[in-house]
A protein has these predicted regions:
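Hydrophobic alpha-helical elements and their junctions with loops/disorder across both membrane
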Residues: 9-12, 31-32, 36
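Terminal leader/tail segments of proteins
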Residues: 39-204
Length: 204
């Protein structure tokens, strides 16, 4: 009795019963895995913004995260991507990034900060920065807590934006779109942990 109690679990069972239990566990895993995957996909589909469903057919949910800076909660971010998306070539794929803000920000401040972050990935001339900043201020509204801003990256075309589900404009400049979405998706981002969370599971 003492030896049996100390033995690893299952070692005292007859071989035929052990085999039967292993088969049952395997069958259970095969049944549960597709179910769990289906539930996860259904939950993701249920929260898919209508503008994403319309603008990016077959969008696949990727990652989500919350940005905190010095303890302050800034926004929640969610990313959807087109089939075949690759992290290292994010600028070649369609993607939708949603930011649900947790604090208030002026449109001018968002635009100015965006230029600062975009400069981490490329040199931007003062004239180009001024033009893009003006374009962003034209498109972006002032933000209140719980407001939702969503951007769609259109490779080779530019970027379109929605505010609380309503279209607010687009910036038809592929270079702008690449650098703007690079704020979150480029290896040069100032928030590598956020990038990793958004791109979790993405092919490289």
């Amino acid at each position: 009795m003492t030896d049996t109690a100390q033995a690893p679990s299952g070692m005292w069972l007859p071989a035929s019963l052990q085999a039967l239990m292993r088969m049952a566990c395997l069958l259970l895993a095969l049944l549960v895995s597709p179910l769990s995957s289906a539930v996860a996909q259904a939950q993701a589909a249920a929260t898919l913004p209508a503008e994403v469903a319309q603008a990016l057919p077959q969008a696949e949910p990727l990652g989500q995260t919350r940005l905190r800076v010095w303890g302050f909660q800034i926004y929640d971010a969610r990313l959807w991507v087109a089939p075949g998306f690759r992290a290292q070539r994010f600028d070649q794929h369609g993607a939708a990034l949603e930011l649900t803000y947790l604090r208030a920000f002026a449109a001018a401040d968002i635009a100015a900060r965006s230029i600062t972050e975009m400069r981490r990935s490329a040199d931007i001339s003062p004239a180009q920065a001024a033009q893009w900043q003006k374009e962003m201020q034209r498109v972006f509204p002032d933000i209140k807590p719980s407001d939702r801003l969503l951007g769609l990256h259109k490779p080779g075309v530019g970027a379109s934006f929605w505010f609380n589900g309503k279209p607010v404009g687009e910036i038809a400049d592929p270079a702008f779109a690449r650098l703007f979405f690079g704020i979150w998706l480029s290896p040069q981002t100032s928030e590598p942990a956020m990038r990793a969370a958004l791109l979790v599971g993405a092919a490289q």
